[in-house]
A protein has these predicted regions:
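A short alpha-helical cap/connector motif
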Residues: 1-160
């Protein structure tokens, strides 16, 4: 696993300094750039995940926040709306699509996500590789409950 992240870091380093993808000398980096960074195809799951995101952006449901991580510099507890979390903390559309393409390209058997939030990133990952086991951890019980509801909406059963 460590080697995989080293290779991904190499990709980003080389890709950021290359003028074109053809100046990438590593075959791994070239393949990853083509399959993940240069891919502009619209996949079936994007529409479904974004429909769930739009539902969350319209939701005024209040959630109790329990933040065990770095979080904000303010309080670690309190209430927040689903809309605010979906707007400010969830994976963006671009990040989600990049996660989808990366998972689709790498075809892992197991994925681990730490800090699920509302499950947007999890939905992209689970939809990309339906045969993979996705383990998603969220410390805040209310966020985990919303994430589970969202995953059930898309019938993503490969997430635990």
């Amino acid at each position: 696993m460590k080697a995989f992240w080293f290779r991904v870091r190499q990709l980003l380093y080389f890709y950021s300094r290359a003028v074109t993808k053809y100046q990438l000398h590593s075959p791994f980096v070239f393949d990853l750039a083509n399959a993940v960074l240069e891919d502009s195809r619209w996949y079936y799951a994007f529409r479904d995940v974004e429909a769930v995101r739009n539902q969350m952006l319209a939701s005024d449901v209040q959630l109790e926040v329990v933040d065990y991580g770095a979080g904000h510099s303010g309080s670690r507890t309190g209430k927040v709306t689903v809309r605010k979390v979906a707007r400010d903390a969830a994976s963006s559309r671009r990040q989600g699509q990049m996660l989808f393409r990366l998972a689709d390209w790498a075809r892992p058997r197991t994925l681990l996500e730490l800090g699920t939030s509302l499950g947007i990133g999890t939905m992209y990952l689970a939809a990309a590789v339906r045969s993979a086991r996705v383990v998603s951890l969220e410390g805040c019980p209310d966020f985990a409950k919303v994430a589970r509801i969202n995953l059930d909406l898309l019938d993503l059963k490969n997430v635990s």
